């Protein structure tokens, strides 16, 4: 399962950089775990070059060849079984079970769906595999004759799966009578901090968007013993905030310079992030933390981003090979829609009752101020599996 976690985390960084190309000055927030899971479901129904391209984008082969580049023809022509399908399926099954464990001290509601035009019926074997390994039942729907009704039904299902937090995933023009297959992924997350902020300490303070512009935010504050790590190139500081039971952590990566976010984003690699956030790099400090309250709800039509990353054949009617999914030819992926919701406040990711405890340490710790009053990167990690569930940047209140 370690190789799957590595693939998901590598995808997180590559995908964030792709989104950043067309989102200058904008917030970014997505779930690499959610997108990887939904694309893996599609991958298992593809063959040939279509499968090889998806494997490339999802980083399934990267651990076998650290020198591969997106343009590598060798990778494009890789056989579907370059990494055993059984391994991918069972790894996802294990990871899904770990992350969605009902004993976890957080709520993670995921809506994963594959919707295919009913004149392109799914293979029974594919339907069985999706239910067994992913807990998902692909749906045959009537895009051809009732696209609007189908869109509303999909949106209603997503809304119910995410406890009403994610609405209208598919916009008005998302599907039409020519739509053949749509992939949807929406995630709602709710967690409680191990150490909660006191609302009495929250004040309106300026958030410096750049050296010349600032906006007021509600800035939370607390002084606690927290894990901190230092980044030398580029100059930045990182901090780990545990959620209750320490199943999950929020990591903040704050550039030293107000305008240093772009440089930090470009510098982040899987290897560097693993090094920075390793236990060896963490030091316990008495931290005076200032963190803005914020709510992010970002929607993405992933077709263009995924195509430009190398996964183009799946969206091309004349090239797509979904023979592992349906007996009908000409089936192709019309669109991929993803939406994630997060709210960072005094209690955690959504207001809820809860108490935090603190370990009492008699040794005197060095003091440090962590003032997130300018653009920063953040991600939420599932600690047992080391998987990045959510990744984002906050630069525009």
Curated annotation (Swiss-Prot):
Keyword set, alphabetical order: Cytoplasm, Nucleus, Protease inhibitor, Serine protease inhibitor
One Pfam family named in its UniProt record: Serpin
Predominant subcellular localization, coarse grouping: nucleus
GO CC term (a single one): cytoplasm
Site, Reactive bond: residue positions: 362-363
Subcellular location: Nucleus; Cytoplasm
Renumbered ranges of motif Nuclear localization signal: 74-77
A GO term for molecular function: serine-type endopeptidase inhibitor activity
The keyword Nucleus belongs to this UniProt entry's keyword annotation: yes
Similarity-based family: Belongs to the serpin family. Ov-serpin subfamily.
Function as written in the Swiss-Prot or TrEMBL entry: Protease inhibitor that may play a role in the regulation of protease activities during hematopoiesis and apoptosis induced by TNF. May regulate protease activities in the cytoplasm and in the nucleus.
The protein's name in its UniProt record: Serpin B10
């Amino acid at each position: 399962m370690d190789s799957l976690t590595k693939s998901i985390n590598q995808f997180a960084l590559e995908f964030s950089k792709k989104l950043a190309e067309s989102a200058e000055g904008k917030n970014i927030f997505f779930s690499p775990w959610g997108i990887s899971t939904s694309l893996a479901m599609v991958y298992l129904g593809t063959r040939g070059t279509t499968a090889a391209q998806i494997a490339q984008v999802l980083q399934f082969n990267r651990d076998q060849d650290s020198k591969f580049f997106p343009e590598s023809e060798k990778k494009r022509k890789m056989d579907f079984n370059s990494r055993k399908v059984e391994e991918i399926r069972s790894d996802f099954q294990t990871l899904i079970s770990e992350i969605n464990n009902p004993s976890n001290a957080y709520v993670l509601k995921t809506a994963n769906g594959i919707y295919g035009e009913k004149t392109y019926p799914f293979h029974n074997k594919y339907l069985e595999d999706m239910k067994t390994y992913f807990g998902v039942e692909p749906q045959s729907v009537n895009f051809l004759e009732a696209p609007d009704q189908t869109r509303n039904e999909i949106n209603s299902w997503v809304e119910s799966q995410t406890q009403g937090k994610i609405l209208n995933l598919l916009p008005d023009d998302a599907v039409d009578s020519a739509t053949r297959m749509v992939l949807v992924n929406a995630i709602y997350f709710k967690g409680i901090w191990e150490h909660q902020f006191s609302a009495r300490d929250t004040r309106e303070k300026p958030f410096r968007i750049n050296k010349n512009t600032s906006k007021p935010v509600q800035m939370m504050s607390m002084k606690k013993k927290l894990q901190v790590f230092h980044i030398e190139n580029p100059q930045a500081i990182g901090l780990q905030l545990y959620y209750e039971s320490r199943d999950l952590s929020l990591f903040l990566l704050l550039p030293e310079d107000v305008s240093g976010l772009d440089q930090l984003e470009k510098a982040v690699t899987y290897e560097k992030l693993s090094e920075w956030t390793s236990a060896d790099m963490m030091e316990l400090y008495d931290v005076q933390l200032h963190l803005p309250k914020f709510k992010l709800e970002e929607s993405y039509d992933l077709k263009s981003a995924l195509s430009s990353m190398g996964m183009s054949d799946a969206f091309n009617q004349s090239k797509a090979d979904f023979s592992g999914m349906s007996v009908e030819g000409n089936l192709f992926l019309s669109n991929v829609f993803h939406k994630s919701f997060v709210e960072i406040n005094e209690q955690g990711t959504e207001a809820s009752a809860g108490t935090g405890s603190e370990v009492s340490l008699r040794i005197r710790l060095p003091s440090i101020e962590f003032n997130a009053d300018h653009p920063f990167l953040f991600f939420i990690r599932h600690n047992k599996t080391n998987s990045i569930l959510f990744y984002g940047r906050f630069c525009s209140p």
